[in-house]
């Protein structure tokens, strides 16, 4: 298992440049007539929420600075002006309070979108998320649903230290009653968020701060107000020699690694973007392993009890085990609280060279 290369290497860090915004009510329409057909993840999330707020009067957004400040990361820009303070609600700095309020609203039939400024702060509201929201439908014998979304930035950023860099995908992925989504591209963000808002179950929607300003090509289909995505994995790059299964920002590093492996070593790597942690698309994972006979998983979480560990267990317990020609490798974050110093922070998370090195070891390439 790899957590990093033995030498410190520069990481391709997504820039957090300011983004210009189209008014949410016209964002998707403007793109339909644009020759570029690109959208940032931030714009995708913004347009998804705008369309769902417009579609259903029971949907509302609540959280710290989501209204007058347009969101800490400007994801909710323009929503207050369009929908008013009854639908876009600023709160005090009290995650336990506003999350409990939102869960109560969901139990009464409304459809809240709860924004955490960071999912690290969701720990202040963990009882409401994993007990009240996740378990009520089951404990009521299916008579009481709790339709809501918990969303916000999750995982590592740049220079924010140990208490603001954790990836909570394994935490929430272990809870029955929750669905956990992990978008990578603008199309992922738009389609999955719209699906999550319409889902009758509570959904944890884990975004990545460093992807907010990244632009992606987006299809005509994805610009439709009715566009949603299923909670299924996506093959981002076809390959025949090894499968790289990953999610959110590590998809970017995995695609870069696949390009290097092809050009430098003639290795054809298949890159699988999970898009959903719970439900986990085990069928897609088994299928790619049976195709390539080799597997590595890539995540920025701590090594122990992570998403990669669950994937390894699922593969070992399935028919895919008989197709493996080498042990599975996990590429993870380091087993330490995230350092603040840049040199140490760079060393704490996977990047493109780390993935290349792991693939070479699995395939016994010198």
UniProtKB/Swiss-Prot annotation:
Protein name per its UniProtKB record: Pyruvate dehydrogenase E1 component subunit beta, mitochondrial
Main location class: mitochondrion
Record flagged with keyword GTP-binding: no
Species: Saccharomyces cerevisiae (strain ATCC 204508 / S288c) (Baker's yeast)
SMART domains for the chain: Transket_pyr
EC number: 1.2.4.1
Enzyme class at the top of the EC tree: oxidoreductase
Binding-site residues, thiamine diphosphate: 95
Subcellular location(s) of the protein: Mitochondrion matrix
Annotated organelle transit peptide span: 1-33
């Amino acid at each position: 298992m790899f957590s990093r290369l033995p030498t410190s290497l520069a990481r391709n860090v997504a820039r957090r440049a300011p983004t210009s915004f189209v008014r949410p009510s016209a964002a998707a329409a403007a793109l339909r007539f644009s020759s570029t057909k690109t959208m940032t993840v931030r714009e995708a999330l913004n347009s998804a929420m705008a369309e769902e707020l417009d579609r259903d009067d029971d949907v509302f957004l609540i959280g710290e600075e989501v209204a007058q400040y347009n969101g800490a990361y400007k994801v909710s820009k323009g929503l207050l002006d369009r929908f008013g303070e009854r639908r876009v609600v600023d709160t005090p700095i009290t995650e336990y309070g506003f999350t409990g309020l939102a869960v109560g609203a969901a139990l009464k039939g409304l459809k809240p979108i709860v924004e955490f400024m960071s999912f690290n702060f969701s720990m202040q509201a963990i009882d409401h998320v994993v007990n009240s929201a996740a378990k009520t439908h089951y404990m009521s014998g299916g008579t009481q649903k709790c339709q809501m979304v918990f969303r916000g930035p999750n995982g590592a950023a740049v220079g924010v230290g140990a208490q603001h860099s954790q990836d909570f995908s394994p935490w929430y992925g272990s809870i029955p009653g929750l669905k956990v989504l992990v978008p990578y591209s603008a199309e992922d963000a738009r389609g999955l968020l719209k699906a999550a808002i319409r889902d009758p179950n509570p959904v944890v929607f884990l975004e990545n701060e460093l992807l907010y300003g990244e632009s992606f090509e987006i299809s005509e289909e994805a610009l439709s107000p009715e566009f949603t995505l299923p909670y299924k994995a996506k093959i981002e790059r076809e390959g025949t020699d090894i499968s790289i299964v990953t999610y959110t920002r590590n998809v970017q590093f995995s695609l870069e690694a696949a390009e290097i492996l092809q050009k430098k070593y003639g290795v054809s790597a298949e890159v699988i973007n999970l898009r959903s942690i719970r439900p986990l698309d085990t069928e897609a994972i088994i299928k790619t392993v049976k195709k390539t006979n080799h597997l590595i998983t890539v995540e920025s979480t701590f090594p122990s009890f992570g998403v990669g560990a669950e994937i390894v267990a699922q593969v070992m317990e399935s028919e895919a085990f008989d197709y493996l020609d080498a042990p599975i490798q996990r590429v993870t974050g380091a087993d330490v609280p995230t350092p603040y110093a840049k040199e140490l922070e760079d060393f704490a998370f996977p990047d493109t060279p780390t993935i290349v090195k792991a693939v070479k070891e699995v395939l016994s390439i010198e």
